[in-house]
Amino acid sequence: MKQYLDLLNRILTEGVHKEDRTGTGTISVFGHQMRFNLEEGFPLVTTKKLHLKSIIHELLWFLQGDTNVKYLQDNGVRIWNEWADANGDLGHIYGYQWRSWPDYNGGFIDQISEAIETIKHNPDSRRIIVSAWNVADLNNMNLPPCHAFFQFYVANGRLSLQLYQRSADTFLGVPFNIASYALLLQMVAQVTGLQTGDFVHTLGDTHIYTNHLEQVKLQLSREPRPLPQMKINPDIKDIFSFKYEDFELVNYDPWPHIAGKVSV
């Protein structure tokens, strides 16, 4: 994935040193965009092995509107543990906002269902947006959303998705985010009867933590390998009916995993 490696190189070349909330420190650039044509393969980084199980289970967890880590932990996924309270709760994070955004009449808005219906019945709409950035609810989230909102776009029978990510941990987080939203795009395309188009990833504060610099340099020394393909059970026609077993990654031949400490 040349786009991703180019981003790492840009940060190392142009980035400025900044202090951050975690106290770790970063090298950062502001504003970057990557585009992935999913017909060319599933955009899963090959210069280090990624834990696809975590990516799939997290996305299914979001789509169910769940905000407690029990489901993740039951499936061997620990990526949210650092932010959970003693009961495993994370507050009104992604899943809550996607499926239960509070309205002003005491009810809730299921943004995912509304987006699906709009794609089916009004595909030329410029309002097919799902937002996790609920300003009135930020204080009720254990971690405010980094990938803040996304928009669908339909043209010539192809569905594309653009994500705006306000804060991008380029070594640890961004490879997960690319794969997660590319998978979401494939799933929505299937349930709406469209072909898969482009995933466009727009980044705000785009950074490498200073304790990841050696890992990044190691990753940049590795030659990218051909992208894998993601096969999805074609019988699933409802976005909320997908299970982990409905996904099969084929021809993934990554370099070995590179460990890095998450900054909390």
UniProtKB/Swiss-Prot annotation:
GO terms for cellular component: cytosol. It is found in: Cytoplasm. Its EC number is 2.1.1.45. Pfam families: Thymidylat_synt. It catalyses: dUMP + (6R)-5,10-methylene-5,6,7,8-tetrahydrofolate = 7,8-dihydrofolate + dTMP. One of its GO terms (biological process) is dTMP biosynthetic process. DUMP binds at residues 21, 126-127, 166-169, 177, 207-209. The active site is at residue 146. NCBIfam families: PRK01827.1-3 (NF002497), PRK01827.1-5 (NF002499), thym_sym (TIGR03284). This is Thymidylate synthase.
